[in-house]
Amino acid sequence: MARPLCPACGSRSVQKWGRTSSGAQRWRCGDCRGAFTLKIDNSAKRLDEFLGWLLSKKRQADMPGAGRTFRSRTREFWHVWPLPPVTGEVCRVVFVDGIYLARNVCVLIARSEEHVLGWYVSKSENSRAYKALMARIAPPDVVVTDGGSGFQKARRELWPNTRVQRCTFHAFEQVKRYTTTRPRTQAGVDLYALAKKLLKAEDSGQAAAWLAAYARWCSDYDEFLREETTNDEGRTFLTHERLVKARNSLTALVRQNTLFTYVDPALTERLGALPATNNAVESLNGQPRHMLREHRGLSLERRVKAVCWWCHMHTECPLPAAEILRAMSTDESIAREMRAMSYEDRASLGPQRWGDGLVWEELHRSTPWGRDWD
C-alpha cells in the first residue's frame, strides 16, 4: 500500500500509528508530528444513488427509516446545478420547447432527434432566454418550434440561415381555441375544417392546395369578417373578432413561410423526411413532468433542479458522477463568485449560463422566512 500524504504538510514521511476506536488505520507524520486517518470519499456513489431515486418511481416512504437516512446521505446534491454542455454537433433538426414549473419559471429545452442538446432556466419565453439557450448550440438546418414569444428575434440574430418549421399541431390548436369544435357560423365551420386539413398535408402538392383553399376562404369571407357592431355605450368593435384572430394567426404563418417547411423539395432532397410537429419532443418533455408527479412535494427550486438533472442525464454523453462533482457549480460557488464581483462586472456578464440572474435572487432568501411561488 502506498504511503498517503499528510493532509497538514503534504509530506510522505508517515507511518502507521495504531488504530482508532472504530478500527480505522491511524497515521502519524514524521515531519509535523500530526496524526490523521484516511477518509474514503463516497460522494460519487451517493450521487448515483440520488440520481437513481430521482429518475425512478421509488418513494422515500418505502426506504428504510422512511427515507430519513437517504435524505441525510443525499441532501448535499440538491445544491448542485447541472450545467448544459457546449456541443459542436451540427444537427439536421432541432426541437425547441419550454416547460413551465410555475407562473414565472420556465425551463427552455433544445433537443435533437436523439438526445437533449441544452437547457436554460428563465422567467418566461423571451428573446434573451432563447438567445442564451441557442448560443451554446450549433445552428441546425431546420428548427421546429411551437411559436413561443421571442424565439423569432433570437433566431434572426443567432441562427439566421436556419429554416423554421412552425408546429402544425400548435397552429391547429390556436385556430380551434378561437373557433371551438362547434363553430356557430359557416365561416367558422369552413375555417375549422381547413385547420384540420393542415395536419394531413404530406407533400408540396397538398401544401399548395391548402394554401389555395385558405386564400379562397379569406376572399369569400372578407366582407363578412369586416362587419362591425356598436354597443349601447357607442363603442364599435368587430362582430366576428374571434374569427378574425384565428385568420390573422394563420395569415402570419403563411406570410412567414413557416407552415410547410417540412415539404419544401429543396430541403427534403438534401435532408430527407422532416417533422411537421414537435410532438416527439412534447412527449419526451412529458417525462420530466411525470418525474415531478412521482416526487410530489418538492419545492420550486428543487423542481427546477430536478428538470435540469433529467436534461443532463438525457444528453448524448452524461458525465460520470465523480466528474459531475468536479465540474458542476453549486449554490455556494455561485454565491461566492457573485459576491466577489462588483455590480458593474455582474451587469457586463449578462445572464448566467444556468438561468436568469433574477431567478437566482428569487429562489434564494436572505431571511429564515420564505415566500410561496405557486
Short names for language-model regions:
Residues M1-P4:
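A broadly conserved sequence feature marking short terminus-proximal activation segments
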Residues C6-C9, C29:
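Short cysteine-rich clusters marking metal-coordination/redox-active sites
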Residues S11-Q15, T37:
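Short functional micro-motifs and their immediate structural scaffolds
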Residues K16-R26:
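Short linker/helix segments within small regulatory modules
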Residues R26, R33, T37-E49, V142-G148, ...:
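Acidic/histidine-rich catalytic cores and adjacent linkers
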Residues R28, A35, A66-N161, A280:
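RNase H-like nuclease fold core
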Residues L54-P64:
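Short, charged amphipathic recognition helices of the HTH superfamily
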Residues D97, D146-A195:
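Conserved beta-strand -> loop -> alpha-helix junction used to position metal-binding or nucleic-acid-contacting
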